[in-house]
Amino acid sequence: MPPLRGFSDNPFSDKGDVIVATTALVQALEPYFSPGQARVRLPIYSGAHFDEVAADLEGFARPIWAIAAVFAESATTTDPTLQTYAERLVSGLANGVDPGHPEYWGAIDDWDQRMVEAEAISFALLLAPKTFYEPLSAHSRSHLVEWLSGLNGKVMPKNNWRWFRIFANLALHRVCGVPYEDVKHFIWEDFALLDTFQLDNGWAADGPWRKDATDGEEAYGRQADYYSGSFAIQFSQLLYTIFAADLDPGRVSRYIHQAREFAGQFWRYFDKDGAPIPFGRSLTYRFAMGAFYAAFALAGAYDSSSPYTSPGFVKGMLLRHLRWWATHSDNVFALDGTLTIGYLYPNMFMCEDYNSPQSPYWAMKSFVMLALASNDELWQADELPHPLAAIEETKSLESGVKLLSAPFQILCDHPDGQHHFMISGGQFCVWPLKATQAKYSKFAYSSAFGFSVPTGLLLTQIAPDSTLAISGDDGETWVTR
């Protein structure tokens, strides 16, 4: 698998470097736009559990996280590739929400994947309305309101998805002119559920947190993973502080406080070189693991009273992570330069049933800080080193070990062994996803070694790393924990 020029050789040291990476990533997608620009379909098939139109919408919407950020300051850019790409998106948006167009995305139904992509579209409308809303005709604007309003009243999972509807309603009000009173009750209904996910120290679970084995909690798991931080909840909370400061000042203040608390612990999910600890589901989103720091910077949530919330620290955490992916991307991209389903190499065993070929482009959430001007304090600050770099100088094992009580984990760094790992004994996922036991319930996870997922029932197929495996019939069958 070839590296991708512009990403794999990228030093990721400043804003210009991130723009170069964005250009490289979206340029590979250009041949796969539909004639009406509303769909992007890569020339492979994964059998995701939703329809192909929704999968094509993923390909259209997910790069918007970066493209909208590029156009936050101005409706034009000097990069011709990104300018053309944005124009494609505007045309595609108009056609995708038009029920009379052949490339209509379809109305949003219960449990619909379209809900997920509505957040990225709403983000673009909120952040860069001059680029993504003002060019639309009155006819297209009406269709857009109808399509986004389709989330309201629909059944959604009890997890991070509720944020997608909140952002759709924010865009309806802030950009499309829908009165706040018409959407406020939908927003507050979703907040009533999301508030129940909150744990200690800024953490939030990705769904109701099972406290014990009492009746009535059988449908609940214990999941506090990258969805809690970078993929969804903390990420969306921070973006909410940007777009709802006057509408909901109390909640905005609370979310900023929680983000600062979370920042004091989340850095331990990464080693001193920026390598993340692979844990939980949806790892095919790859460098979206660092998106918490991109959103933190965009929200300007800095606090000089903590060493973990300064511009230099946030910049270091984010850019080190992107550099790590750049230097480990030789097998991440397909021959045409598009992202593959997998982690450090294409891997369908560890993917989810909701991963279409276009799904990996959620990785571009880590580029939302491109909305910040070149003279912003993030770009002007010097990168600060990872705290563990200083710890290793002292050769102090104890200072590299920390109990994170909220997610039931102990984060460890062994300076002599140069090993960064997590001991995790209390999380589990009850949703019927692929290999959830391997993704949540092993005893340990490491930034140096990917964990194995079972491919069959034989011991060699189970590959029980960080797992207790017991056989009562001379190896015919195995029970694992």
Please describe what each predicted stretch is.
Residues 38, 76, 157, 272-276, ...:
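Intrinsically disordered or highly flexible coil/loop and linker segments, enriched in small
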Residues 297-481:
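Extended polysaccharide-engagement surfaces of secreted carbohydrate-active enzymes
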